[in-house]
Design a protein with these regions (language model features):
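Conserved beta-strand hairpin/beta-sheet module of binuclear metal-dependent hydrolase folds
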Residues: 1-46, 145-166
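Residue in the alpha/beta-hydrolase core beta-strand immediately N-terminal to the catalytic nucleophile
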Residues: 27, 54, 134-135
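Active-site HxH/HxHxD metal-binding segment of metal-dependent hydrolases
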Residues: 33-130, 161-162
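A generic secondary-structure signal marking the coil-to-beta-strand transition
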Residues: 2, 14, 25, 79, ...
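Core dinuclear metal-dependent hydrolase active-site scaffold
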Residues: 17, 122-154
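Short Pro/Gly-enriched coil loops immediately N-terminal to beta-strands
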Residues: 10, 109, 138-139
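Short Gly/Pro-enriched turn/cap motifs at secondary-structure boundaries
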Residues: 6-8, 115, 134-137
Length: 166
């Protein structure tokens, strides 16, 4: 599995794209504002579509482009967007939780159409990506730790930093 780390200019959040070998789909995690084009580049380079979107918590810098990215499923289908339950209310108006106005490059907020509560048990969010959520409230009410098991090749700006060939 390859893990692409995509730094965002929106409060320095990181978006992630997890691409399991041979699956044809990817899991996009925390698609922040200002990185849509970079997420799309990774998807095109890998030859995959979006299988699901995971939001680790409900802060705006982690959720902003989830609605758009969720429409990049196979043949333009809309895929589920998962978020820990306690943060669901934040999706109605995430900008209201910012201490200041969002940066100029941040577009208008659009709530995802297929927003789902992240299950507490281990689930396969997209083919080949099994994730288990462990609640860890503090940063937000819905903050969580997400556990998975897979050999990883970690990439930043398409450069490999760590490869585990297990």
């Amino acid at each position: 599995m390859r893990l692409h780390v995509i730094p965002s200019p929106f409060y320095a959040a990181n978006g992630l794209v997890l691409v399991p070998s041979g699956a044809g789909t990817a899991l996009v995690v925390d698609p922040s504002a200002g990185i849509q084009h970079l997420i799309r580049e990774v998807l095109q380079t890998e030859g995959v579509s979006v299988g699901a979107v995971l939001l680790t918590h409900g802060h705006p810098d982690h959720v902003w482009d989830a609605a758009e990215v969720s429409t990049w499923g196979l043949d333009g289908t809309t895929v589920p967007v998962y978020l820990p339950g306690p943060d669901m209310y934040r999706m109605d108006a995430p900008a209201s939780f910012l201490p200041m106005s969002p940066p100029d490059f941040v577009g208008e907020w659009v709530k995802p159409t297929d927003l789902r509560e992240m299950p507490a048990e281990s689930v396969e969010l997209t083919l080949g990506v099994w994730i288990r959520m462990v609640p860890a409230p503090g940063h937000t009410e819905g903050s969580a730790v997400f556990l998975g098991h897979s050999p990883l090749d970690i990439r930043v700006n398409n450069q490999s930093f760590y490869a585990n060939e297990e």
